[in-house]
Amino acid sequence: MSPQTETKAGVGFQAGVKDYKLTYYTPEYETKDTDILAAFRVSPQPGVPPEEAGAAVAAESSTGTWTTVWTDGLTSLDRYKGRCYHIEPVAGEDSQWICYVAYPLDLFEEGSVTNMFTSIVGNVFGFKALRALRLEDLRIPPTYSKTFQGPPHGIQVERDKLNKYGRPLLGCTIKPKLGLSAKNYGRACYECLRGGLDFTKDDENVNSQPFMRWRDRFVFCAEAIYKSQAETGEIKGHYLNATAGTCEEMIKRAVFARELGVPIVMHDYLTGGFTANTTLAHYCRDNGLLLHIHRAMHAVIDRQKNHGMHFRVLAKALRMSGGDHIHSGTVVGKLEGEREMTLGFVDLLRDDFIEKDRARGIFFTQDWVSMPGVIPVASGGIHVWHMPALTEIFGDDSVLQFGGGTLGHPWGNAPGAAANRVALEACVQARNEGRDLAREGNEIIRAACKWSPELAAACEVWKAIKFEFEPVDTIDKKV
């Protein structure tokens, strides 16, 4: 060994492997206002103490690796390392802990959800010392959130663009989602919009397939929008899905939508990717387009309770990346969603300031400062009998989207849309008169049926349809 090598090895460096907790578990640490805070649900392998597991998560998602490296001496680990600063057992579970990790802000590129997730949930989820790992929540400090544009427009600007106030907006996903020609697709859009809906929607997997190329669909849907607007005197829209195989193609589709003069486009933000989504959100703000976001693929990531990432984290990431609407579950429909948990992340989407509330799954107080809000979209297995509950649960700043609940009407698409509009107007009027929608909902709908044969027919068709399954992902409750 040369003298040079001996000198390098002998100055403040000891090779080998040491426990993560010696460096990355710091229960005495006081978090800073500028730290990004994360709450992980950690399930260690047998024999791995929670302190070591939490420290491993902090290390592997920040500056650490499996062994000591001499280049640690070339930087300040105390400045850049993640720190596991608190651990608590999960109620009702023998071998799960919530580990809280603080990350210094300098670890992350400004305005990049992609970089934030690459660090926090990149490698660590495959770590062998853990049986399972789930990111439950993030606290995004204003010093970081202000580096993002956020939603292209936000709730109030959208209401002003549409000139629609004091009620939820109504939408419909065109079905069958695949197989229609562009002209028949546009016809279905027109009938739904003419019948009383505010929006119609491309399904998430409608892009540019052989049976219906995107440009043809855009043209026929624009025709449906203009014709229905002329006949109803209301502003209408169709979520034109601009998701594509490349960012360049996606922007080309958004440009064509703008040239047609339509008000809104759509993106599948998880399958399309956060870089593409942020790019499209910036284009939409610069060019006056609203942006509807579909969360296709989310359940692959968020549905299992002990591994993956909770949707509240994906919702926060979307608000930062940019979107004016996002699907959020229904509570009452066919898709997963516990009520209190759903309302928790709905508030995280819409409100400026959200207090910590573990009863709703919110681990940290979140201050969005002036970032615009996102409208939650309730969609999936809902029909007219659900209208009172949806109006009561989601309030005015929401989109209630009935696909089969519009197009499945026995008299056709326009009567299906009319039935939904009548049901909504009846519920909003009853609420404004002080009636209890949760208790009197069925009575309100039955009364409205007397002066709407379309609603009466819809109520008869779906009177026995229910989706009564226990949710998989639930709030932890003390036993």
UniProtKB/Swiss-Prot annotation:
Cofactor note: Binds 1 Mg(2+) ion per subunit.
Gene3D superfamilies cross-referenced by the UniProt entry: Ribulose bisphosphate carboxylase, large subunit, C-terminal domain, RuBisCO large subunit, N-terminal domain
Catalyses which reaction(s): 2 (2R)-3-phosphoglycerate + 2 H(+) = D-ribulose 1,5-bisphosphate + CO2 + H2O; D-ribulose 1,5-bisphosphate + O2 = 2-phosphoglycolate + (2R)-3-phosphoglycerate + 2 H(+)
Keywords, ordered alphabetically: Acetylation, Calvin cycle, Carbon dioxide fixation, Chloroplast, Disulfide bond, Lyase, Magnesium, Metal-binding, Monooxygenase, Oxidoreductase, Photorespiration, Photosynthesis, Plastid
Quaternary structure note: Heterohexadecamer of 8 large chains and 8 small chains; disulfide-linked. The disulfide link is formed within the large subunit homodimers.
Similarity comment: Belongs to the RuBisCO large chain family. Type I subfamily.
Protein name: Ribulose bisphosphate carboxylase large chain
Gene that this polypeptide is encoded by: rbcL
